[in-house]
Amino acid sequence: MEKTFLMVKPDGVQRAFIGEIVARFEKKGFQLVGAKLMQVTPEIAGQHYAEHTEKPFFGELVDFITSGPVFAMVWQGEGVVDTARNMMGKTRPHEAAPGTIRGDFGVTVAKNIIHGSDSLESAEREIAIFFKEEELVDYSKLMNEWIY
């Protein structure tokens, strides 16, 4: 089944949105298979934002993501990558629709509450950066037969 990586960023953790965000994805019917509160190191941040290394805002990205704890998660379900992107809303909170996470809670592009993988390939790469294989739990949820 398809998996995606989501991360409540330091601003979302500090503003106490972890529970709200987890609840939204659970209510949608997705299955949480890995989660941890963690401090991102500069090394992990560099791997995570590798495609932005040469961009002028790279240092700010690393500084922000390492400024406080994050809540890293792996979710699975049919179409979870695209659906999660839609649930998060556009990157710029002022462009994000009401009802989306960023539309409801985001303040600025830099402090937009949540990160989510933008493709299956990105999800695989990001999951491998933040989680060891043994940290992911494969289990059956009885409600899946009512969803899929």
Swiss-Prot record:
ATP binds at K9, F57, R85, T91, R102, N112. Its main location: cytoplasm. One of its GO terms (biological process) is UTP biosynthetic process. Its EC number is 2.7.4.6. PROSITE patterns: NDPK, NDPK_LIKE. The modification Phosphothreonine is found at T91. It catalyses: a 2'-deoxyribonucleoside 5'-diphosphate + ATP = a 2'-deoxyribonucleoside 5'-triphosphate + ADP; a ribonucleoside 5'-diphosphate + ATP = a ribonucleoside 5'-triphosphate + ADP. Major role in the synthesis of nucleoside triphosphates other than ATP. The ATP gamma phosphate is transferred to the NDP beta phosphate via a ping-pong mechanism, using a phosphorylated active-site intermediate. HAMAP family: NDP_kinase. Homotetramer. This is Nucleoside diphosphate kinase. It comes from Bacillus cereus (strain ATCC 10987 / NRS 248). The lineage of its organism: Bacteria, Bacillati, Bacillota, Bacilli, Bacillales. The gene is ndk.
